[in-house]
């Protein structure tokens, strides 16, 4: 199945190699399989991905999640970054190509920045801090929540951060969170592209300023 989907993607894009290949929402299989069978299945999927790397079809792989890294241990759908890395090591050894994770992060869904859900060497860290500690790159999805949060921001919020629009302020929050490598944001108009490029020219907000937004 993974090989078929990868070949479809390569054909649709007209490419010979993808920079990154994500397994999408694997946590949806946890309830059906149970933890042990789930992580065994993940290792087999990672073995397939290592084969794709060896064949030159992808350069790296990861997991794109919605709930998996945000919910705490013991809650349905929780994914352990440490166990995923163990699976990657079993699939590809120390030089495995499991390099990225994706999770939602925005002003309305700040869990990845605020809530410790991942145990790393006996310490429970936020998903972003855990990814940093484990050497993983992070993409954020829903960085401005498909614009649904923009009308909920208080008057003057954008101006307080030296920005023109609520969308810029929302994106600046997400891209500034320590550990975020890439903040994904869909753009349907050229004007939105220009608006977001303005944000990229600014320095990121300090962690203290980010934390102050949540009291």
Where are these regions (language model features)?
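An active-site-proximal structural segment forming one wall of the substrate-binding cleft
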Residues: 1-17
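Beta/alpha (TIM)-barrel catalytic core signal, keyed to glycine-rich beta->alpha loops juxtaposed to Asp/Glu
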Residues: 7, 26-215
């Amino acid at each position: 199945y993974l090989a078929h989907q990868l070949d479809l993607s390569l054909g649709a894009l007209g490419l010979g190699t993808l920079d990154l290949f994500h397994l999408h929402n694997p946590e949806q299989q946890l309830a059906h399989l149970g933890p042990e069978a789930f992580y065994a299945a993940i290792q087999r999927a990672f073995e397939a991905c290592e084969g794709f790397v060896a064949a030159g079809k992808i350069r790296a792989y990861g997991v794109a999640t919605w709930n998996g890294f945000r919910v705490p241990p013991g809650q349905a759908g929780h994914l352990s970054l440490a166990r995923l890395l163990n699976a990657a090591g079993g699939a590809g050894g120390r030089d495995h190509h499991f390099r990225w994770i994706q999770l939602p992060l925005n002003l309305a869904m700040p869990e990845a920045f605020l809530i410790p859900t991942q145990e790393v060497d006996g310490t429970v860290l936020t998903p972003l801090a855990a990814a940093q500690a484990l050497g993983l790159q992070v993409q954020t999805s829903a960085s401005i929540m498909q614009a649904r949060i923009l009308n909920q921001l208080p008057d003057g919020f954008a101006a307080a951060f030296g920005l023109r629009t609520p969308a810029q302020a929302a994106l600046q929050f997400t891209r500034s969170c320590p550990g975020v490598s890439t903040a994904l944001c869909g753009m349907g108009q050229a004007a939105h592209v220009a608006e977001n490029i303005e944000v990229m020219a600014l320095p990121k907000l300090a962690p203290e300023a980010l934390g102050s937004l949540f009291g």
